Amino acid sequence: MADKINVALIGQGFMGRSHSNAWGQVAKFFDPPLNPIMHTVYGMQGENPQVFAEKWGWKNASTDWDALVKSPEIGIVDIVTPNFMHAPPAKAAIAAGKPCACEKPIAGTLAEAREMAEAAQKAKVDTFVWFNYRRAPAVAFAHQLVKQGVIGEIRHIRASYLQDWADESVPFAWRFKKELAGSGSHGDLNAHIIDMTRFVSGLEIETVCGAIAETFVKQRKIIEQDSGGGIVTDEQMRYAKADAGTAKMGEVTVDDAVLFLVKYNNGAVGSYEAARQATGNQNANGWEINGTKGSLKFNFESMNTLEYYDATRPRGVQGWTTIMCTHGGDHPYVANYWPDAHIIGYEHCFTSMAYDILLKLAGKEPTVPLPDFNDAYQTQRVLEAAMLCAEEKRWINLADVK
């Protein structure tokens, strides 16, 4: 029988539900070397964490994250709070010598991200960052194909993450406040596609240019559930329209859209685009990678498929092939879920990552590489470089962004 490890969840909300589901489901679909026990969830006084605990299967609830992180009963700390609250519990977990998993971006500022990565490296503590899209079978398979040299030398990468939920009717919330979120679409969406393309291609961004950052909606109405600090849940933000609020307006201090160009360490070039008001794109999270022997293309709105172009075939029969990444013998993770061709969904990426985390903690190799605090710090450096480029209107060398 597998050894047990007690999990503490710091935070609730959208990601709290996603992570709770993953920790609760992982031992049902996989045979992890450690059995995760959903020990305690933390929430602020007004969040009523006891209700969350009862609904999502946590044995205990707490309103004191510091005591929870330091408790000798806790084996791993998982952080899902708003971005500005990531660093304190993460540093406390590292100081206590405990493995720490954290949502992305790992911090609201580059300085905090660097401090967290350095602390983890110094303490030699295992850390993990929930760049969950790495665990989509199609993305993990693409990573394997590139490592095998299937598409040859990479020349171009185009990545975009487009959503359309943040129109003028959406009220003010923490996601629109820089001191709480760090950034808008940039940290929320570009962070994912920077990590995904870094993971799939194996390339590092060396320079950034041509960046544009824009905020289209400068003010948003504060809804009644908000006490004035912008701390409302994602559900309140997305489903309570602005006419449910008061006459008071909140100043939006983050971006609605950020676009930028890059050059990679092998000489390849690329582009990135993140937007929350790209009408018609509900969760169009995708990329295309072009190599000398072929290309790969992915869009999360069709997450079970990967597009592959084989340029080594005779010219007369060349064309894009749609691969259903649902075959347990060939595609990562899917054998542990449903029979072949029975598709999986968003939540399974988290469950698969929980499994790989447990493998790593038991000294075993994960299915594909897990992102740690240093990986997230490298992503944060690119985010910072793009914003510097947008502000200063010049090329930015990543070597100068630390």
Language-model regions, residue ranges each:
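C-terminal glycine/acidic-rich active-site capping loop/insertion
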Residues: 13, 217-259, 263-266, 287-288, ...
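Predominantly a Rossmann-like dinucleotide-binding segment in NAD(P)-dependent oxidoreductases
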Residues: 15, 133-251, 306, 393
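Short active-site oxyanion
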Residues: 36-40, 59, 75-77, 184
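Glycine- and charged-residue-rich phosphate/anionic-cofactor binding loop of Rossmann-like
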Residues: 35-39, 360-378
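Glycine-rich phosphate/pyrophosphate-binding beta-alpha loops
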Residues: 191, 273-282, 342
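Short acidic low-complexity segments
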Residues: 31, 60-73
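Beta-strand-loop-alpha-helix segment that lines the small-molecule cofactor/substrate pocket
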Residues: 75-76, 82-134, 149
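N-terminal Rossmann-like dinucleotide-binding module
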Residues: 1-56
